[in-house]
């Protein structure tokens, strides 16, 4: 996950620089007004043409990018600290002086984003390349402008708020990664165009990369992004249409066309990448003073049959892949439901402001599965959580795969109508009763639910009943009650493994045949609680 680590550090630095420059004469009026950088000649552009080009690329041998040794040596010196000393002049941003448009600023290449990308502006169906301009960057540290070749190229770009160019809300840099700061203006988890052979023992994960972008400003501050994707096993054309940010969510309509030049054993669609070290669920295993540290605390699923599922994230100490089979899913996402500062006590990185990211399929996705990959970690600098949609079939060479979906970078914690209560906390401790011997082989689980119609019910009614299903274990001491002074309900039960195999658990609350909550899903594992 080296790419993730570098991306995580680098995108933390967002700032402006103060270098001056002018467009060369002879460019059309719209170019002079909307680009603060030199532009190439005009060429016609269409998404259909980009798809055709990606299809053609897949029939050709893959050509890996080559970095000159001198430049490679310089880039290796641009670490996180050095990168912070290189600032882009926001006055040179694309659409900087266009009323209502979202300005676009560029990233400098560095040790975590070594390959360059090409950028183009689209206006009236014509595209002009945004040419690299060394004067767009100010160098304030040990790296000097003379150290960088004049044709070094861009590493990526970020999209600024139209009314506040000191802040950005979207960034593309490294492989096919991109992410939004969401409605609370705090970067967290990321997305990718595609995932290839993630967490497979027999194959190394492949990271295709965006090689070219075409950017088109939309009315109201939105942006349409076209991208060419290329890698050893796959090429592709991607279109991402971004609505302007608001205080609830940032919506992106995505269309992905992929073409395989080699067989792909596991193709991940709409992949999400996040970080989870510990939460209230595994706080006993933490080695940090802060109560919780995570960008996301659970995987949410809305199945094709309408069931809502919540799977708390875990850091078990070993690589674990969980599969959730479905047919035409309504959506899935990695969510950050705990929005209380007191849960994190970190006023430097503000984990409570990290966005949720919900994937809403468009069209027929058929039968497949959401896979959740949890990689062990002992630090917050590592992105160790991956989730994506996939099938159990290998994609042979020469195939075309196409998916459409909608991305919601949001803060609500649950997408769509809150017909059922959501899980807001998953805690555990020693099984048994106070004042009696506590068997070490069991655990007590306490799950808090909130929302939907659940608040209408009182404990004394005797209507709300727990439904608990376990595999390879015995359940004891189960009950549900309303938490005094709140609208929450708490489900509590003990689990004793029988030693036969993995212990999978499902639990929810219902009134008769009516589910009142999400289905909580988790895999029990032994813990040393003393």
Language-model features, listed with the residues they occupy:
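A contiguous, surface-exposed recognition patch within enzymatic or periplasmic domains that forms
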Residues: 81, 182, 265, 269-400, ...
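Terminal accessory/anchoring regions of large secretory-pathway or extracellular enzymes
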Residues: 34-80, 89, 346-530
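N-terminal export signals
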Residues: 1-3, 9-31
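Acidic, contiguous internal or C-terminal segments within carbohydrate-active enzymes
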Residues: 227-275
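Extended, loop-rich substrate-binding clefts of extracytoplasmic carbohydrate-active enzymes
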Residues: 192-245, 363-378, 382
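Hydrophobic residues positioned within well-ordered beta-strands of beta-sheet architectures
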Residues: 117, 223-225, 236-240, 252-254, ...
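Short polybasic amphipathic segments
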Residues: 116-122, 299-301, 333, 507
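Solvent-exposed N-terminal domain segments of exported/luminal and surface proteins
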Residues: 62-200
